């Protein structure tokens, strides 16, 4: 009788001990397509593209925007790591950093603090010169908001 109770108790405990499913990294980023905001001047566009050496059709510019607070961000593609820094968003401009990416291959952006990842597909990046990546506040449905655009917002 004691053995049966012990077995039932052990079975009950094992059924209660279920592995918790973590949502880390599994949430998909929000994706937007916008060209309806104020544009930077042609002089500012060409200066940015020259600074990043991104004037060719095979390159897009990834712009890290809001909610970056010094956590490590790693941007890489299948060929190499493009960026591994600790960006901080400027409160006035809302810009943390700009990075040139190769738009012929998929690009991964990884937030080392939140253990979240976003993938910028080559198919979408090829269609847009500027890609804005905003980090959503913790606890939201998605870790990032990606905005694809052919319009450069003023960076100053």
Identify the meaning behind each predicted range.
Residues 1-4:
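Positively charged n-region of N-terminal signal peptides that target proteins for export
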Residues 6-11:
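Sec-dependent N-terminal signal peptides
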Residues 14-16:
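C-terminal motif of bacterial Sec signal peptides marking the signal peptidase cleavage site
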